[in-house]
């Protein structure tokens, strides 16, 4: 063949059955040329010229690569639907064939296991074919040689021996496991019985009825702590009993009471745990859980009451309650665990350890008393139903302690003040007696309507009262001081009631209720000073009274109280100069100064004519005159 003929093998392009709609053509133009504002006549002519000079074969190659992208959207959707329909048909066909096979196998097995085979049969097969209607068997099996039968028999015997050996081993293992389980159960129930015999309440858990629990909490506590007082008694693998406390803290926690005096810690309560030996025993675990729960409830109630006592100076922080006792002393309460005690290196003295321990024991006893009161209220008939929610009052834990400490502080102050006055008067040669009856309101109960312990606690919850009676230097003067402290019901705080018996001054009556120590000291000092003036006048009268065989001397003066509230006495003499003495009294000492007067109320300018004498509480100067001797010498 001299010449070769080349024919292009191009695919035939079928014409479309329908024309594209106008929106489709506009979308195609936008995709190919962009927006219409970018299309101009010049750009179209340039494109036509470029197409004329373009290689047609290159166009065919490009068209082959882009043929898949030019397929119409509707055609692609049709192809997609067709492919999905084919896949669905194939899946349905496979499902039908699998169901046919399942029905065949189920019908075949229904002759030997009808119940199991019936569960996998379709409903149509159950209707058209009864169970066990199809069977299979081997027809004309080939004969087996004698050696094969012998081998099968030997293998069967080996399998039987192996199965017997395995069964024997399983029986021995089961016996060993049963023996250990019996030993574990025996140990578990013995320890449970020991816990019950020691007085603990053993019961089923409310939400886990198959488990046992021990009730170590207090039934009269608040609900949040009452529900935490139940712990499960679990059994370990070896049968040992252990306490599952759930969310309860694993470490021992205790309420610590410290005394802060003059900025430093001067005392701390004993916070060592009570359980020190055999900590791992179940009894000690229960005791530790009970004590920790009790301490947490105690601190919770203390903190709850302390928030209410903010107006009385009580300060609450995150884990601390600070109670003011006096200007120099505060009480600190906080909840600590054993790790905090080991890491606490705060320097402190042990001067007030007894006070801290007493406060700690007191609030523990008061919480137990509150539990008894809850039990008493629960056993009584309930109050009438009401839509209003009943408020749960705060327990009396801090208020009785604060009342006792404040009352003791005020009683010690009054006693110290009267002792100072007594020593001052004794150093001046005056006779004075006072009697102190601290806590006179506390009396042991005589009626046994309630338990003795509760009656004793109720006595300390009542307002505290102490009395001081004093006989003044004069023959008829006396006063009585009653110190009353109440921290439970208003009026709160400590009040002083002073009653006076002074015939020389019948109109003098101090205020019935005094709240400040300075005012009490001023009132008592003033009353004693007035009585000293009365004693001076009585002594002078007894000295100037003439007897039956004697006449009064002209040198004796008669003193009169011109300004008694200023401590001044005046003596008017018809023959000599007039005299005046001024008495000043305080807890630090007694001072008397005499003046010579030209007129009735004019003091002498001559300083040599004035005399003064003072007496201190611890004055032991020999030869110093007493008050009456000094006045007589005037």
Curated annotation (Swiss-Prot):
**Location(s), subcellular:** Nucleus
Q: Does the keyword NAD apply?
A: no
What's a GO biological-process term for it?
A: regulation of transcription by RNA polymerase II
Asked if the Swiss-Prot or TrEMBL record annotates the protein with the keyword ATP-binding, the reply is no
Q: Which Pfam families match?
A: Med17 (PF10156)
Q: Where is this region: Disordered?
A: 51-73, 606-626
- Lineage, top-rank taxon, reads Eukaryota
Q: Which UniProt keywords apply?
A: Activator, Nucleus, Transcription, Transcription regulation
Where is it chiefly localized? Answer: nucleus
Q: Name one GO molecular function term.
A: transcription coregulator activity
Biased composition range(s): Polar residues: 611-623
Q: Which InterPro entries match?
A: Mediator_Med17
Q: Which GO terms describe its cellular component?
A: core mediator complex; mediator complex
Family per similarity comment: Belongs to the Mediator complex subunit 17 family.
Q: What does this protein do?
A: Component of the Mediator complex, a coactivator involved in the regulated transcription of nearly all RNA polymerase II-dependent genes. Mediator functions as a bridge to convey information from gene-specific regulatory proteins to the basal RNA polymerase II transcription machinery. Mediator is recruited to promoters by direct interactions with regulatory proteins and serves as a scaffold for the assembly of a functional preinitiation complex with RNA polymerase II and the general transcription factors.
Fill in the subunit field for this protein. Component of the Mediator complex.
Write down what this protein is called: Mediator of RNA polymerase II transcription subunit 17
């Amino acid at each position: 063949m001299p010449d070769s003929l080349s024919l292009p093998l191009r695919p035939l392009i079928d014409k479309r059955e329908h024309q594209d709609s106008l929106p489709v053509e506009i979308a195609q133009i936008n995709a190919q040329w962009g927006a219409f504002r970018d299309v101009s006549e010049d750009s179209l002519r340039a494109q036509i010229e470029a197409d004329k000079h373009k290689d047609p074969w290159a166009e065919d190659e490009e068209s082959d690569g882009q043929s898949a992208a030019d397929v119409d959207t509707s055609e692609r959707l049709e192809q997609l639907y067709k492919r999905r329909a084919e896949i669905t048909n194939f899946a349905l066909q496979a499902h039908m064939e699998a169901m046919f096979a399942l029905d065949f196998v189920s019908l075949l097995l229904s002759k030997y296991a009808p119940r199991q085979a019936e569960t996998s049969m379709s409903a149509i097969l159950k209707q058209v074919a009864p169970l066990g209607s199809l069977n299979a068997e081997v027809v004309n099996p080939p004969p087996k040689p004698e050696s094969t039968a012998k081998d099968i028999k030997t293998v069967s015997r080996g399998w039987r021996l192996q199965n017997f050996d395995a069964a024997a081993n399983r029986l021995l293992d089961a016996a060993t496991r049963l023996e250990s389980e019996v030993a574990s159960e025996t140990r578990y129930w013995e320890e449970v019985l020991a816990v019950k015999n020691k007085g603990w309440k053993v019961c089923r858990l409310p939400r886990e009825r198959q488990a046992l629990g021990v009730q170590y909490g207090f039934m009269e506590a608040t609900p949040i702590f009452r529900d935490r007082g139940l712990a499960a008694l679990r059994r370990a693998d070896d049968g040992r009993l252990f306490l599952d406390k759930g969310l309860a803290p694993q470490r021992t926690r205790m309420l610590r009471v410290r005394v802060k005096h003059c900025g430093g810690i001067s005392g701390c309560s004993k916070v060592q745990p009570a359980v020190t030996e055999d900590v791992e025993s179940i009894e000690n675990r229960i005791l530790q859980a009970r004590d920790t729960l009790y301490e947490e409830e105690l601190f919770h109630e203390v903190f709850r009451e302390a928030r209410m006592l903010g107006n009385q100076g009580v300060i609450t922080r995150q884990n601390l309650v600070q109670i003011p006792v006096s200007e120099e002393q505060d009480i600190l309460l906080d909840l600590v665990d054993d790790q905090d005690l080991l890491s606490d290196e705060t320097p402190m003295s042990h001067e007030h350890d007894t006070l801290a321990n007493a406060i700690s024991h007191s609030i523990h006893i008061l919480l137990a008393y509150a539990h008894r009161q809850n039990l008493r209220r629960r056993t009584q008939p309930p109050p009438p139903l009401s839509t209003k929610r009943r408020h749960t009052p705060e327990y009396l834990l801090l208020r009785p302690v604060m009342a006792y400490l404040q009352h003791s502080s005020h009683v010690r102050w009054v006693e110290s003040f009267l002792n100072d006055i007594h020593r001052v008067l004794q150093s001046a040669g005056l006779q004075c007696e006072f009697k102190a009856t601290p806590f006179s309101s506390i009396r042991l109960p005589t009626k046994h309507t309630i338990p003795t312990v509760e009656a004793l606690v109720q006595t300390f919850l009542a307002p505290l009262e102490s009395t001081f009676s004093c006989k003044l230097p004069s023959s008829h003067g006396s006063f009585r001081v009653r110190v009353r402290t109440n921290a439970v019901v208003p009026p709160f705080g400590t009040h002083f009631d002073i009653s006076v018996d002074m015939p020389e001054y019948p109109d003098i009556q101090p205020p019935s209720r005094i709240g400040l120590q300075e005012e009490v000291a001023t009132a008592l000092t003033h009353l004693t000073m007035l009585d000293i003036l009365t004693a001076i006048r009585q002594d002078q009268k007894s000295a100037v009274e003439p007897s039956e065989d004697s006449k009064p001397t002209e040198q004796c003066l008669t003193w009169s109280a011109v300004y008694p509230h200023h401590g001044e006495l005046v003596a008017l003499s018809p023959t000599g100069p007039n005299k005046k003495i001024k008495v000043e009294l305080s807890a630090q000492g007694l001072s008397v100064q005499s003046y010579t007067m030209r007129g009735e109320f004019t003091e002498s300018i001559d300083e040599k004519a004035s005399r003064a004498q003072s007496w201190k509480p611890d004055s032991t100067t020999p030869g110093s005159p007493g008050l009456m001797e000094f006045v007589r010498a005037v």
